[in-house]
């Protein structure tokens, strides 16, 4: 992930300079600088349609439409991917707040029979029937896409893995407002309770970072 590594190095330098300046002003002592490790590259995965679901988060107006990264990069990546997902017969579920449930962007709008979850927190599993509905359909793996990686995607991935789901996150279908926040989001996801620091493909009950062109169905 060249972009991520570049962002990490740049962000680390900025953080070090800012921290050093602040500490120098307050104490006059040398500062301690830290650098985040580089994220692993996305990996190829092969999924079984019968036990896989696509979970779509906040591709809605105005949340996605007001964010250049969501509208300009994420949406063009997820639109053809979703078409392939539906063609493979994968279950599709949607989660957003009540006020935006009717505002899904037309490129990725729900189809009849799709699961719809109204959430009150960023974790779509918290106080909803999502787990019940997915398990009733025999789902064990969730592909998670949407806005934003450091918010709903990160928290919902934790909610999924603690409920024994294996999670796949295509890195081109989620992001945050800044490159720095995007990297932090992916880092959080891989370092959650059921961590996958090396990004082992489809590590059970853990998150895996992949990409839309690296996900196939058998």
Identify the role of each PLM range.
Residues 56-57, 91-97:
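Short beta-strand segments at enzyme active-site cores
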Residues 25-53, 80, 99-218:
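Active-site-adjacent betaalpha module
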Residues 27-33, 64-72:
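Acidic/histidine-rich helix-loop elements
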Residues 20-24:
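Sec/Tat signal peptide C-region and signal peptidase I cleavage site
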């Amino acid at each position: 992930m060249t972009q991520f590594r570049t962002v990490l190095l740049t962000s680390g330098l900025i953080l070090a300079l800012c921290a050093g300046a602040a500490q120098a002003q307050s104490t006059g002592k040398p500062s301690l600088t830290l650098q985040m490790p580089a994220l692993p590259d996305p990996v190829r995965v092969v999924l079984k349609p019968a036990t896989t679901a696509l979970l779509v988060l906040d591709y809605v107006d105005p949340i996605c439409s007001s964010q250049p990264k969501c509208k300009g990069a994420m949406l063009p990546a997820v639109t053809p991917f979703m078409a392939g997902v539906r063609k493979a017969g994968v279950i599709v579920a949607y989660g957003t707040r009540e006020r935006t449930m009717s505002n899904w962007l037309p490129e990725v709008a729900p189809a009849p029979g799709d699961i719809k979850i109204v959430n009150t927190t960023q974790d779509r599993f918290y106080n909803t029937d999502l787990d019940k509905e997915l398990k009733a359909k025999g789902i064990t793996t969730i592909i998670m896409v949407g806005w934003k990686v450091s918010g709903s995607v990160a928290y919902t991935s934790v909610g999924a893995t603690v409920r024994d789901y294996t999670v796949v996150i295509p890195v081109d279908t989620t992001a945050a407002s800044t490159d720095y926040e995007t990297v932090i989001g992916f880092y959080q996801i891989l370092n959650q309770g059921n961590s996958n620091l090396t990004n082992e493909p489809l590590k059970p009950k853990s998150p895996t970072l992949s990409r839309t062109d690296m996900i196939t169905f058998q």
